[in-house]
């Protein structure tokens, strides 16, 4: 077989402090978001040829540690880092790797993630249309971009975490 495009979009998250979440939930996030993505990518790579594409769904959570979303954000940081490294490794074979890093998207994700049953207001305000997110990610992949960030607010967030120290941003976002 000749695989021209693979999309790794499986993943889940659980919101809550580490000690409040079940260990199985946390290790499950690592298994699905990191191990499964790596395994699928590794299994398909031998069947990919020149001008093939790999689109890995990370998250804007990959850009900054997230209290109460710690394991999820860490797994998505893994996806982003792995995708960037893989893009360099596969460059000589002309296989292009893109990490899609959307913010909150209107899917059933938060039905599973939000353990309190309430989606925070700021997340509801910036929720993106899933079709638009996918369309942008596919377009960015076809253009050979290594990172796809959807929407102006997430692009600003992406720039802020590059400019300001993470501890400063975290203190603003999560001050109690």
Language-model regions: role of each:
Residues 59:
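Residue(s) in the substrate-gating loop at a strand-loop-helix junction
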Residues 17-18, 25-27:
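Substrate-binding pocket helix/loop in short-chain dehydrogenase/reductase
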Residues 41, 75:
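Active-site helix of classical SDR
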Residues 19, 66-70:
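Active-site loop immediately N-terminal to the catalytic Tyr-X3-Lys motif
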Residues 47-48, 64, 85-95:
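Active-site-adjacent segment of SDR/Rossmann-fold oxidoreductases
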Residues 9-14:
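Conserved NAD(P)H cofactor-binding loop of Rossmann-fold oxidoreductase domains
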Residues 92-152:
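SDR active-site lid
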